[in-house]
């Protein structure tokens, strides 16, 4: 870690031109944060990102309990079911890349949100209908993950787009 810190500090040149560099003084940082926080598009993208992440982490924190303890999935098989979530995320990312050739980022974002909401809603409907089996959890969550894979890159890029000289603060 120390070697990497030295390499980064002294071996990688600063890519930003001097006239665009931001000061690390507290007043300058606070001014940047205030500017960023007042931007409605930044707030929208950030809230969208936060909501998608909250759905993701809700699943991550409860999935082992639901699948193993409630639905009886053997612990050695849990990883296989979990791989479906990873596959869904990858499919979403690859779909976003392909759609990026003909759609603007916000159009991809909306499509991803529709897919994610559909997955979450389907899981809720199945649970309320007392459909309790592994696939009633895995398939809707995989659908949610496809949407997540489409949404997250768009929200991050959108949040940073208006602040090219303050990307470190905005991220």
Placement of each model-derived feature along the sequence:
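Helix-loop-helix hairpin linking two adjacent transmembrane segments in secondary transporters
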Residues: 1-12, 16, 80
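Juxtamembrane intracellular "pre-TM" segments in multi-pass secondary transporters
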Residues: 13-46
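Pair of pore-lining "gating" transmembrane helices in MFS-fold secondary transporters
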Residues: 38-58, 142-146
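Short amphipathic helix-loop junctions that connect adjacent transmembrane helices
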Residues: 61-77
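Small-residue hotspots at the loop-to-helix junctions and early N-terminal turns
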Residues: 75-83, 171
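Helix-to-loop junctions at the C-terminal end of transmembrane segments
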Residues: 91-107
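C-terminal transmembrane helical hairpin of 12-TM major facilitator-type secondary transporters
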Residues: 107-155
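Paired intracellular helix-loop junctions of major facilitator superfamily
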Residues: 157-168
């Amino acid at each position: 870690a120390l070697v990497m810190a030295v390499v980064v500090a002294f071996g990688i040149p600063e890519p930003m031109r001097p006239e665009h560099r931001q000061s690390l003084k507290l007043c300058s940082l606070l001014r940047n944060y205030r500017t960023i926080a007042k931007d409605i598009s930044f707030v929208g993208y950030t809230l969208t990102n936060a909501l998608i992440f909250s759905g993701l982490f809700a699943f991550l924190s409860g999935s082992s309990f639901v699948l193993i303890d409630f639905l009886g999935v053997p612990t050695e098989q849990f990883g296989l079911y979990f791989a479906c979530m990873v596959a869904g995320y990858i499919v979403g990312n690859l779909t976003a890349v392909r759609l990026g050739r003909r759609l603007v980022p916000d159009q991809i974002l909306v499509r991803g949100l529709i897919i994610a909401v559909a997955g979450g809603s389907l899981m809720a409907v199945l649970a309320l209908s007392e459909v309790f089996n592994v696939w009633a959890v895995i398939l809707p969550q995989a659908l949610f993950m496809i949407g997540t894979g489409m949404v997250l890159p768009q929200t991050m890029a959108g949040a940073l787009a208006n602040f090219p000289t303050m990307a470190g603060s905005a991220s």
